[in-house]
Every structure is written in C-alpha cells, then in structure tokens.
C-alpha cells in the first residue's frame, strides 16, 4: 500500500517551468529556455545549469518573483489528485529543483504536506543571481527520498514518485 507520494513540481504539478516563467517576465527567456530543456533532458549538469540560469535573473525585483510564484499555473487535475491522495492518508511531498518562491504558494493551495526546493538569494528586494538549497544537484532528490523513507520508516514499495526530467 502506498504511504508516500513524491511529486516533482515544474511540468509535473505545475504547467511549465518556474525558471522559464521568471525569465520571460524579466526579458531573459531566450537565454534561459534552451538551457532548461537541455538540463531536463540530462544533457547538462543540473547544478551548473541551475546556477547559469539563475545568474540571468540577477537584478530582478524579488517582489515580482513572489507575485509570479503566487500565480503559477497548476496542471489540470492537480487539485483533484492531491485531494484524492490526502483522502487516502497518503503523505504528499514536493521535491523541486526549482524554488520555494514557487512551490510554497502551490503547497498551500494544494494542501501538500511538505516541500523541498531551492531559494533565490536576494537583498534589498533584488535577486543576486545566486541560488542555494537542498535540491541543487542531480542526485539531491534521490538522497532526500532515502532520508524521508528512513524518517517515516517506509519501504520502497510504499513510495510512489512522479516526475518528468532527468533529475527526477
């Protein structure tokens, strides 16, 4: 019986890639989108590509990031799926190579139990172009899943994972 369901966020629960949406709002879409596609296909190192993509956001107003994070489009059926899993007492978690600025509002809307992601560094309401957090490497999700399984005392057959990219 499934007791834990872990979802990726970008292009899985959310319809699109947060970094691409932020880049478009900051007129840096062209610079970021190709890197995102290549990283998700496993052609680029996830950590290096994340750093490079975030560097293009340097100078972006942080309050704009937060507003965009509030309005990210969720996939059709996301609410119903999470509601169903919650009704079965399945612990629902988001593992995102994206950002808390995007997943945190969605977690509240969807009633997700827990989320792990990265943070966009900022000072004086301006992005620094740097990123940090628990999901910065290609193996971060696997390591966090193992920790979570141990913490919840679960076996592999009690866990379901849903994702779309090379780091999922």
Residues of each region from the PLM?
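A generic local structural motif
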Residues: 78-80, 146-148, 166
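Alpha-helical substrate-recognition element adjacent to the catalytic core
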Residues: 1-119
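Substrate-recognition "cap/lid" segment bordering the active-site pocket of phosphatases
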Residues: 105-159
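A cross-family signal for key residues in well-ordered alpha-helices
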Residues: 20, 146, 163
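Acidic, divalent-metal-coordinating active-site segment for phosphoryl/phosphodiester hydrolysis
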Residues: 101-103, 163-168
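Short, hydrophobic beta-strand segments that form beta-sheet elements in well-ordered domains
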Residues: 94, 160-163
């Amino acid at each position: 019986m499934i007791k834990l369901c872990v979802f990726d966020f970008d292009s899985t629960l959310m319809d699109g890639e947060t970094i691409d949406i932020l880049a478009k709002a900051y007129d840096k879409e062209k610079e970021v989108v190709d890197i995102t596609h290549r990283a998700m296909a496993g052609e680029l190192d996830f950590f290096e590509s994340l750093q490079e993509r975030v560097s293009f956001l340097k100078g972006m107003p942080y309050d704009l990031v937060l507003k965009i994070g509030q309005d990210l489009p969720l996939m059709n059926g996301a609410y119903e799926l999470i509601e169903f899993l919650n009704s079965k007492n399945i612990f629902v978690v988001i593992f995102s190579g994206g950002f808390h600025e995007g997943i945190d509002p969605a977690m509240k809307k969807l009633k997700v139990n827990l989320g792990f992601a990265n943070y966009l560094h900022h000072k004086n309401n301006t992005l620094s172009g740097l990123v940090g957090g628990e999901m910065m490497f290609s193996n971060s999700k696997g390591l966090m899943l193992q920790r979570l399984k141990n913490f919840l005392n679960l076996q592999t057959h009690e866990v379901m994972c849903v994702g779309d990219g090379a780091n999922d």
